[in-house]
Amino acid sequence: MEQFPQSSPRGPRRAPDNQAPHERPRADRRTGESRRGPSPHRTPTNKGSHAAKTNTGATRSSATDQQATARPKSRYIPALDGLRTLAVVAVVLYHLNLTWAQGGLLGVTIFFVLSGYLITRLLLNEVAKTGRIDLKSFWIRRIRRLVPAVVTVVFVTCALCTIFNHVMLTKMRPDILPSLLFFNNWWQIAQNVSYFNALGDPSPLTHFWSLAIEEQFYLIWPPLLFAMVSMHVSKPNTRRVVLGLAAVSALAMMVLYNPAADPSRVYYGTDTRVFSLLLGAWMAFIPDRDLAPVRLAHRLGLNRLAGTAKHGKNAEGKSGEKADESAETAPAQPSALVRFWSSPASIDVLGVVGLVGLAAMVALTNGYTAFQYRGGTLLCSILTLMVIAACVQPQGMVARALSAEPLVWVGKRSYSIYLWHYPLLLLMNPVANINDTPWWQYILQVLLVVAVAECSYRFIETPFRKGAFGRTVAEFRDGTTTPANWARAHVPVCAACAVVLVIALGGLIFVPETSALSGEGAEVLNKEAKNTAPADQQAADDTDKDNDGFPDGSYDLLMIGDSVSLRAVDSFDGVFPHSHIDAEKGRQFDAGRATFEGYIQQNLAGKIVVFALGTN
């Protein structure tokens, strides 16, 4: 049974008989050479010394081979950056509200699977090298990788909203702390905020919900894996545990989804989304070479047939004259299925099917469909695994295509693009802008997002990831330099930080709360109310008295809203006689629909019904 590597190396292990000679461990072949005796071309040496050296070398080589087999190799896979590019492009297209990319929100699912896969590869590689997981070091690396860019985006967005859009500043105020502390998703759930239905501009920090789920995974998964390693749980059993947890999470999404309610609880929840990360983690336990076509045939139980076709062996693995004697037991020709799974094309077919499936889901699904929550997100995760399997085979067609330099370039900056695109696109495309945006403006907006992301990647993420902050602090401690001298040497950086902080903090402190109906909309209503004739106002008052309680006959206009609608009650009643506002703080669309059904049952819903929900 395959185990996690322990601190003490084991002795050499002989390759299975059904394994092809070229697949046997190097140490086994060396041991075979030693059994045949020294080469006549070598200088004779002491036999005892030679045997000892041979055995020691075989043991070391076998132990090294075992570790290499037990862990995924720590190597850079450029095709995975190409897959990141496809994911972030899907998300950006979705937030541009393009009708042919309403399923672009599935790009986040692709990110989840990739994150679970790559993080688990790193952890398994560390276990293979050291036999343990340094949790403190892991979390410090995650903080250096993620937090500097997050803090920058939050404060720059505050500054931009202070200058350009006070409604967005009001929306993002309560989201700042949850975003910085990575519990944004649970905050949105607690506030009953819909991801899909919002009146007016949403919070520019809404997209931080996915970062929160990833950080929560990084907080819980490494200790859990370390615990299983410490308890010497075998790799097959660990894989079963991971797959079981993923199944529970996927089932939770299906069970908790209610077609009659807003799906945001299921969409935001860590418990209902973590299966994508866990499926990626599960795949990380499979060595890259086991995803090669011949090894896939082995896992499918086709290895003997594949070996027969390739090496001319019989069903019992014999060759030569014995193979001729047993020819009756060996198949004359391998089946088409065997030939397919043994060919390099098989893994590319999996990858292409995965890519086509993902593209179809982006084009044909959206966040409202029941399919999305009753198997669609799970299917997206499985399709992503198929693409990853093709990406880790560097000679494959899919891997070469996704390793194209432009795709890799964008993929390396996908985290920055994801962070910056949402607030920038919201500021450039506010809800109040009802004019059609020409295609060339969208292109300019995307180019601006990429330019800002490049600056963030080059001047914020990369220096922090490479330890620039730690080195600067060390210089302060050693007395090599002082904060004042450092500031004089980095005047542009300090000036930019100071300007952003002053504007952002000034906006948070001094700009009053502003809502979609408390600004220009409220001014229009108040102006109209003042211009209303006294006779009309008296008629409205008389009508309101008749409407107290639930009057006979329906309202001419019924408005069902949340707390923002309450602010317009006085002006609304003056402008629209025989009308009624039913407003409640924190009300969302599912509750608004139930309220509306109540008015229908009492014959009070008139010809015009206004829903003003999702603003808070």
Predicted regions and their residues:
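Residue-identity detector for glycine
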Residues: 11, 32, 37, 48, ...
